[in-house]
């Protein structure tokens, strides 16, 4: 991912304002509600029968926290996303057989949640920078599939 110094500074500054645990829980919850076929990977999480059940599910929240912390780790290694996500790419490809399109969809949910949480601070320029990052992360996670 090619980011300017200004974009990197914006990402770093805005990320510091984000409650990562809440954002991760909300992003994964939204993914499961908006794209219900993604639930197939989480059937063992218990009740996913409605939007409120998904959004209140403790296991969804815990996994969302895990996901967003991996994303945050990627923010520290923007120049080596493929290396940063290599083991997760292998896991999701070889063992979990996740559709690589789901990574892009999750990235969309992360951007939506950031817009919601950051409000007016999430300017169009900031969104453009984060869109580059989530696309880069999705590509890195899908790398093993190629």
UniProtKB/Swiss-Prot annotation:
Residues carrying N6-acetyllysine: 82, 144
Q: Does the keyword Nucleotidyltransferase apply?
A: no
**Signal sequence residues:** none
Q: Which keywords annotate this record?
A: Acetylation, Heme, Iron, Metal-binding, Oxygen transport, S-nitrosylation, Transport
GO terms in the biological process aspect are: hydrogen peroxide catabolic process
- Which positions are annotated as binding heme b? 63, 92
In the record, S-nitrosocysteine modifications are located at 93
Q: Which family does it belong to?
A: Belongs to the globin family.
Any idea what this protein is called? Answer: Hemoglobin subunit beta
